[in-house]
Design a protein with these regions (language model features):
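Acidic, Ser/Thr/Pro
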Residues: 31-221
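N-terminal amphipathic/hydrophobic targeting modules at extreme N-termini
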Residues: 2-4, 14-16, 20, 24-28
Length: 221
C-alpha cells in the first residue's frame, strides 16, 4: 500500500533520507498521497498525519541527523515539547516505546520501532542562520530552522511560535562522566536504519535533513 521512489545517491556531506507514511488504520487514502519520499540534502519536508498513522524515517546512508518537530493539526500553538517529554518519560532522551508529549502535556508521537542503536538527542537546539554566522560562515547557509518553516509553509500553514527545540533523530550527544558536560559525536547509525513514530493525535510533522557541515555531527563529515 505504499508507492516508493528510488532514493537519491550522493557523496555530499549532507546525505538524503527517506520518510514513509504507512497507514495503519482503515482510512480512505490514495497511493499518491501515501508514498515514500526523499528529503533532499540540506532541505526539509512536512507531512500531515491522522491519529494512528505511522511515520517511518529511514537513514538510507546511515550518516544523517534528522531534526524533527510536531504540532497539533488543529492548533499549532500546541507543539512537541522536549522538556515536557523528559518530565513524562523521566529520561534524558527518548527510547523505543516512549511517548512524546506536547507543551500541553498531551501525547503526540510514540516511538514504535527503532532499528538504529537508539541514540537520539533532545537537548541541542536546531541549527539556524545565526548559529552558522557565529561559526564563521559568511552569507546564507541552509539550516534546519528555515527548513522547518519552509516545509510547514508548503502545506499551507504558518508556525505561530517557532522554536529552536527539535528532536534530533540519530544525533549522538554524549553525557560525560561528570554528569554535566556534553560531547558532540558522529552518528552511529548504519545504512538502512530506521525509526517509526505513531501519531497519537492528528498532527503535522516537519523533518529536516540537517545541513550542519561545520561541527562534526554527521558520521562522514
Amino acid at each position: 500500500m505504499v508507492w516508493s521512489t528510488d532514493a537519491a545517491t550522493s557523496n555530499d556531506v549532507n546525505q538524503t533520507i527517506n520518510w514513509q507514511c504507512i497507514i495503519l488504520s482503515a482510512l480512505p487514502f490514495s497511493l499518491k498521497e501515501n508514498r515514500m519520499k526523499t528529503i533532499e540534502a540540506c532541505h526539509g519536508k512536512a507531512i500531515e498525519l491522522k491519529a494512528g498513522n505511522s511515520l517511518k524515517v529511514i537513514n538510507i546512508h546511515g550518516s544523517q541527523v534528522v531534526d524533527l518537530w510536531a504540532w497539533n493539526g488543529s492548533n499549532l500553538n500546541e507543539y512537541l515539547s522536549l522538556e515536557a517529554t523528559r518530565v513524562w518519560s523521566q529520561r534524558l532522551n527518548p527510547q523505543l516505546g516512549d511517548t512524546l508529549v506536547t507543551n500541553m502535556r498531551n501525547p503526540i508521537l510514540t516511538i514504535v520501532q527503532d532499528t538504529s542503536p537508539g541514540i537520539h538527542d533532545s537537548f541541542m537546539a536546531c541549527c539556524d542562520l545565526p548559529r552558522y554566522h557565529r561559526l564563521g560562515v559568511n552569507g546564507y547557509h541552509r539550516n534546519c530552522f528555515d527548513n522547518m518553516l519552509e516545509s510547514v509553509s508548503e502545506l499551507g500553514y504558518k508556525v505561530p511560535n517557532p522554536t529552536l527545540a527539535s528532536l534530533n533523530v540519530f544525533m549522538n550527544i554524549a553525557v560525560l562522566e561528570d554528569g554535566i558536560s556534553l560531547a558532540t559525536r558522529p552518528v552511529e547509525t548504519k545504512a538502512g536504519d530506521y525509526i517509526t513514530f505513531r501519531a497519537e493525535m492528528d498532527c503535522i510533522v516537519s523533518m529536516s535533513s540537517c545541513p550542519q557541515d561545520i561541527v562534526k555531527i554527521q558520521s562522514d563529515v
